[in-house]
Amino acid sequence: MPIINGQKMACGPCIRGHRSTKCNHYNERVMVPVRKPGRPLSTCPCPPGKPCVCGGVRVAIPKKQKCHCPAGTVDSATSSEFDPSPVDTPISPASRTSSNRVTKSGSGSKSASRRQSLALANLERMDPNSINLIPSPNGNGMIGITAMVSPRDATFGHPMGMVPMGPRESFVPAPPPDFGGPMGYNMPPSMPPHMPPPHYPPHIQIPQHIKTENGGFVPMLNGTFVSPVPIPAFVDGPHPQGMQAFNGPPPPPPSNPVLEPSAMSKPKGGSGGGGCCGGGKKAPQIQAPPPVPAPLPTPPQQQMPNIMPPPQPQNAPSGGGGSCCSSKSSQPPPMPQMSPNAMQAPPQPGFGQGFMPQYQTPIDIKMENMHHHQPFQFPGQTVFTYPAEYGSWQMPINPAIWQQVVSRPPTQQQHETPISATAPNGNNGTVGGNSHECGCGEGCQCVGCLAHPFNSQMLQYVQNAYSPNSSHGNSGSADSSANASPSANPLNLASPVEIPSGPELPPSHQTQPQPPPRPNANESDGSSNAPTPPNEGSPALSNEEELTALDYYFVHLPISALCGGALDMCPCDESCECVGCLVHNTAGFPQGDGGFS
């Protein structure tokens, strides 16, 4: 039996099953205090003038237990494991003894064998001639692309898959397609007869064994005509040099920059005019390629401004040295021409700079809302953090503390603690406080959930553990009340005051349920009924195990039905002057104690 801070505790199922002395679930379940053997008290043993603490139980929630808050995937997995499947029913013993079940299983095996006949391995045994192929609606085999329509498609015979079936045969092989005459007489109107065949680049050649008709179409076996190469944009002649970038490798530009240093070195030799003329002669060779690739935004285009300056000396051949200087001075003007293209790069960082504040603004607003507005106000709150001093043996969590944590706006310290505690699941003890993460929401009914410790299932868990005692206590209270004298109640009420441990109750009287088992005078009266309580037995002292209170969270549950006697109540109104009244005249009760005695 676990003993936590001198209090014997056990789980609820072990208390109900009279196994509290053998309980070893101190790391798995919520621990409930075990009452001492004997009949419960017929009256409230709390001292007069003090709040009744009999209506509450201090339970211990293990910190090492797994979080019982269910997840969607875990529930589906566990439910699928325990739900009986139809495959398991024939294996049950009843199905083996019943003849009908055996026949059903046999029929099921036959159906399974029939299904296996459709396996991929059985497709190899099928006759290819008996397979009926259905072409696509567009005749091309690709979705969304229309096929080429030819005027002779109707004379090619029935397409594959559209073969009429005979009266006795289910599959009829398709007849060979009829290709008809040459395609030259049936050219489409879009290509006139006088148009010469297209000229393809030398790197694109048609194989010799393929016979081409007019227009470059090749007849295929299925009755269609396909072009071996894509029809170029220029059909009536060779492509210009500017389009070679699309049909072949670009012209080698590195040869031109090599000539520029030689041309620039000639003016330094003394013949300035020859250098300029030489640059002018080589300039027309360089002027041809630039105009065509100019609109293309490719990297070679950026190298073209370096080649453009040589034509400028051609306009001023009089001064060789001046022309070279003018060419160098004229090189900067083409660079501003490239500035519009270069200005395309700054908008990208500008867009990024404009986008990042838009992304950072919601974060700042969200953090301000988290500081000024309590996260618990949102219905999706999953983390609850208690101060470090709460949840201990001396200061257990009670409904007032729980409501305070829920309704109080968070401080900066409380706001930082949930962040460090959100990584792991379950109960987490941090330096700043105790936190628990629960994904069930406000309707959580998990037993031992630190975020919702006062749910109905938690209260029912404790009430079920004490239900046998309460039933016997009600029957015993009727007998004791009949045999007890009026002066016995004040004595029993005042007896806890004379106990030396009485002064220790005020600091923690709201949370400690130790006073009920304190009065030992009644234990002798209830010794005859010792076998009645099912909770604790004296001989099992070897099974007791001392546990530290640091491994548990303590919660005080307000359960009023656990009090053995009647709670503090008075039928009078506020003007009550009854001597010894525990509600209205608590100050005069010690004076009347002597009269009762």
Curated annotation (Swiss-Prot):
Residues 287-314 have a biased composition (Pro residues). SMART domains: Copper-fist (SM01090), Cu_FIST (SM00412). Residues 92-103, 521-530 have a biased composition (Polar residues). Zn(2+) binds at residues 11, 14, 23, 25. Pfam families: Copper-fist (PF00649). This is Protein GRISEA. InterPro entries: Copper_Homeo_Regul (IPR051763), Cu_fist_DNA-bd_dom (IPR001083), Cu_fist_DNA-bd_dom_sf (IPR036395). Residues 1-41 bind DNA. GO terms for biological process: intracellular copper ion homeostasis; intracellular iron ion homeostasis; positive regulation of DNA-templated transcription; positive regulation of transcription by RNA polymerase II. Residues 70-115, 233-352, 407-428, 467-541 are annotated as: Disordered. Keywords: Activator, Copper, DNA-binding, Metal-binding, Nucleus, Transcription, Transcription regulation, Zinc. It is found in: Nucleus. Residues 269-281 have a biased composition (Gly residues). Its main location: nucleus. It comes from Podospora anserina (Pleurage anserina). The keyword Cytoplasm does not apply. It comes from the Eukaryota. One of its GO terms (cellular component) is nucleus. Copper-sensing transcription factor that regulates copper uptake by transactivation of Ctr3, a high affinity copper permease. Binds to the palindromic UAS sequence 5'-TGTTGCTCANNNNAGAGCAACT-3'. Also transactivates Sod2, a mitochondrial manganese superoxide dismutase through the palindromic UAS sequence 5'-GTTTGCTCA-3' with 352 bp separating the two inverted repeats. Loss of function indirectly leads to rearrangement of mitochondrial DNA associated with senescence in wild-type strains. The gene is grisea. Residues 104-115, 469-495 have a biased composition (Low complexity). GO terms for molecular function: copper ion binding; DNA-binding transcription factor activity; DNA-binding transcription factor activity, RNA polymerase II-specific; RNA polymerase II cis-regulatory region sequence-specific DNA binding; zinc ion binding.
